[in-house]
From Swiss-Prot:
EC number(s) reported in the record: 3.6.5.-
Full protein name: GTPase Obg
Record: residues binding GTP: 166-173, 191-195, 212-215, 279-282, 310-312
Binding partners and assembly: Monomer.
Sequence ranges assigned to domain Obg in this UniProt record: 1-159
GO MF annotations, alphabetized: GTP binding; GTPase activity; magnesium ion binding
Any one GO BP annotation for this protein: ribosome biogenesis
Protein residues bound to Mg(2+): 173, 193
Entries under PANTHER family matching the protein: DEVELOPMENTALLY REGULATED GTP-BINDING PROTEIN-RELATED (PTHR11702), MITOCHONDRIAL RIBOSOME-ASSOCIATED GTPASE 2 (PTHR11702:SF31)
Entry's Gene Ontology cellular component terms: cytoplasm
Length: 340
């Protein structure tokens, strides 16, 4: 299945139906009063976040979306039926952005969130509404109002507890494949991963969602190598797991390349908690590994972990789980657009 994380949509809510001007017509009733019904309301366009979706692929050939218009009113005080709402399901983590102003309309970052993006037009009034003591037979009615039309950009930012970052071929995909049920493609060449992958990892009594972010390269913050499409997914991660290929000639340079790109893209990303791991340690002698580990640890002034290609992942997974529990226990003030 393909992965689409951005799509432009043209939304048109339904127009309101027109009101009706009609009069009561019955045998032996010469001057029947007005009985024109109101027009029906136009359908709305509503977005709902669905935890069962993980891509915007279903919008690929559906860029113009229109809700039904309300029906016109009729005689005998019959109101037109309302237009049916259009319900659009999107993955959790989808943002709906106004294409013209570039402002975020809503951020659907929790399952089951519902938000009306385009409102249907009001139905027109039938002539019954204009009857008065001075106007017993009004012929006046109103037309329905047009529904809202909006051009929006849907952006999907993958939601995960942990984001695996690193240069291409650092072993991110294999790590995720080994510790989860993800079917990530693995190969011994750069850019095996061309889209984010999510995996669910069971750690003791906890579940951890881990995202394999495609390899980041120099100038990714400028969009090189689809950098913007990859970097935005890191914004949603609570913890970063930074994998570095221990066989790299300069592990400090390999670390700095990724760190700098994150900072240039969004300085908040480098404030996230980060666990640094030298990967593929079974490919070098112990003395070489220790030298590189100490060199990187001294540069970062923090602990650096080591991992073999087929080594035990449980210590790292338990560390991630513990840090997530601490992070989740902290009280965080989150802006909720659904609260007044």
């Amino acid at each position: 299945m393909g992965f689409i994380d951005e799509v432009k949509l043209c939304l048109k809510a339904g127009d309101g139906g027109d009101g009706c001007a009609s009069f009561r017509r019955e045998k032996f009733v010469e001057f029947g009063g007005p009985n024109g019904g109101n027009g029906g309301k136009g359908g709305n366009i509503v977005f709902i976040s669905d935890a069962n979706l993980n891509t915007l692929l279903h919008f690929r050939y559906r860029r113009h979306i229109k809700a039904d218009s309300g029906k016109n009113g009729a005689g005998r005080d019959r109101s037109g039926t309302a237009g049916k709402d259009v319900i659009l399901k999107v993955p959790v983590g989808a943002q709906i952005i106004d294409e013209e102003s570039e402002e975020i309309i809503v951020d659907l970052d929790k399952p089951g969130m519902e938000f009306q993006v385009a409102q249907g037009g009001k139905g027109g009034l039938g002539n019954t509404n204009f009857k008065s003591s001075t106007n017993k037979a009004p012929r006046h009615f109103t037309y329905g109002q047009p529904g809202e039309e909006k051009h929006v950009l849907l952006k999907l930012k993958v939601l995960s507890d942990v984001g695996i970052i690193g240069m291409p071929n650092a072993g991110k995909s294999k790590f995720l494949t080994r510790c989860s049920n993800s079917d990530t493609k693995v190969g011994d060449y750069p850019f095996t991963t061309v889209r984010p992958h999510l995996g669910m990892v069971k750690v003791d009594d906890s579940e951890v969602v881990i995202a394999d972010i495609p390899g980041i390269i120099t100038d990714a913050h400028l969009g090189v190598g689809l950098g913007h499409k990859f970097l935005k997914h890191i914004e949603r991660c609570q913890i970063l797991l930074h994998l570095i290929d221990v066989t790299h000639d300069d592990v400090v340079s390999a670390y700095s390349c990724i760190h700098n790109e994150l900072e240039l893209y969004n300085s908040d990303l480098v404030e996230k908690e980060e666990i640094v791991v030298l990967n593929k340690c079974d490919l070098l002698r112990e003395a070489e590994i220790l030298e590189k580990k100490n060199h990187l640890a001294n540069y970062l002034n923090k602990e650096v972990l080591c991992l073999s290609i087929n080594g035990d992942l449980q210590p790292i997974l338990r560390l991630l789980s513990e840090k997530l529990k601490k992070s989740n226990s902290k009280e965080i003030d989150v802006y909720d657009p659904f609260k007044a």
